[in-house]
């Protein structure tokens, strides 16, 4: 029981570090992400080192629209048109929708309603019967209620690496004469993003 508050604090800190990449994706935060481009992880200014390649289309992974059925669908289409370093279409299919706690109900409306959530015309909702359903992932540590993003789970796991150098460890030491106890804990972990 004496370790419980310390363990809870450690878990909270680890989760903050794990979601920092998403929390600061639109700023040039280089705590866990450093690129030769010198732009944010989510940016409309991505470049390529391949000579004579136009970055006019397919290199913009920044969207600023509020979460709605229209913006969700537009971003899915945009992801399918992302290009690699040689400007070839990658056809990346989003299967995860990441949202803060505040947007979870809106995400559920968009993805799971049988009918179009913002229409009185009784149109069908194509997301509700998608062949590859999208999973809602709630980022509990996001503080901006406008943040949301689409990801491909396979590429996310491949490109955002998490490692634990030292798993959380706890120990106590007691003094025989005074019955005083010291409690300590430690852990070392890190994360990095290999590619946007």
Task: List each model region and its residues.
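Long, contiguous amphipathic alpha-helices that act as assembly "spine/axial" helices in icosahedral shell
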Residues: 1-29, 97, 183-185
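Glycine-rich, mobile lid/loop segments that gate access to catalytic sites or pores
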Residues: 14-50
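Catalytic micro-motifs at enzyme active sites that drive phosphoryl/nucleotidyl and oxygen chemistry
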Residues: 18, 84-85
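Sequence/fold signature of self-assembling virion shell proteins
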Residues: 38-84, 91-96, 102-196
């Amino acid at each position: 029981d004496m370790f419980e508050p310390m363990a809870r604090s450690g878990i909270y800190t680890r989760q903050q570090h794990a979601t920092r990449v998403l929390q600061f994706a639109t700023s040039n935060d280089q705590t866990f992400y450093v690129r030769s481009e010198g732009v944010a992880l989510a940016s409309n200014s991505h470049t390529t080192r391949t000579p004579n390649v136009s970055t006019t289309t397919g290199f913009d992974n920044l969207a600023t629209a509020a979460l709605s059925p229209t913006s969700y669908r537009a971003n899915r289409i945009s992801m399918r048109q992302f290009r690699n370093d040689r400007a070839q279409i990658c056809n990346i299919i989003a299967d995860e929708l990441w949202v803060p706690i505040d947007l979870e109900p809106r995400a559920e409306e968009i993805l799971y309603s049988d009918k179009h959530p913002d229409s009185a015309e009784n149109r069908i909702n194509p997301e509700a019967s998608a062949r590859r359903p999208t999973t809602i992932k709630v980022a509990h540590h996001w503080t901006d209620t406008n943040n949301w993003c689409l990801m491909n789970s396979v590429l996310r796991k491949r490109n955002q690496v998490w490692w634990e150098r030292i798993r959380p460890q706890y120990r106590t030491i007691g003094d025989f004469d005074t019955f005083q106890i010291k409690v300590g804990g430690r852990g070392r972990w890190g994360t990095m993003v290999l590619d946007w």
